[in-house]
Amino acid sequence: MNTAAQSLIRDESTPARTRWIWTPFLPLCLIAAAAALRRIFALLGPASPSTSPTAALDADFAARRALTLLHIVPALAFILLLPAWFAHSVRRHPRAIAVITRILLVLGAVIGLTAIPMSFHPVGGINESSASLLYDSLFLFSLARGAWLFHQGRLQLHRTWMMRAIAVLLGIATTRPIVGVFFATQTITHLQPQQFFGTAFWLGFTVTYIAGEAYLRARGTDSVTS
């Protein structure tokens, strides 16, 4: 094992750092996976009743079924692979982690590129679209930076940029409970999905991105921004 790989493993070995990442990480992965599966079943199954609170949202995704599936199926695969990418037991095997990393990079590219047309004419209008495009750009930039560093063999910085991309991606999971709160309080606020989806996206992505940045800086890599 080369020196870079050894130092990368040591960097993630302390129990405190492990707890820092796994405590919020697993719930977000579960939420994201559940949301993706729910959307896949909704697209492949019968249409939602017109009285369903999510009927308008389901109809919007159904109108671009192929694009939506091309976006969320790779996203589901990405989410399911993430625990292995973070697991210390897997990271002890450089070949295995290299294969997983390459798969994540390919899946991430598909997710990021398909998110661009998905961001046009969303349910939440220009507010949602602007949040999606901004954070998708940040995701693609972080992913590309991580890929370049990976192929350069600069594994610690590669991991930093990959984790930055992952924090952006998991922002979509944070939006789900926020959207749930908006739906649950509709009888009080009288807000429609077209009015609150953009706000939910801004809140979800921003909170998760800031949390990810805080973790990276507390983690104390040689350089968080190189």
Residue ranges with predicted function:
Residues N2-S226:
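Alpha-helical membrane insertion/targeting regions
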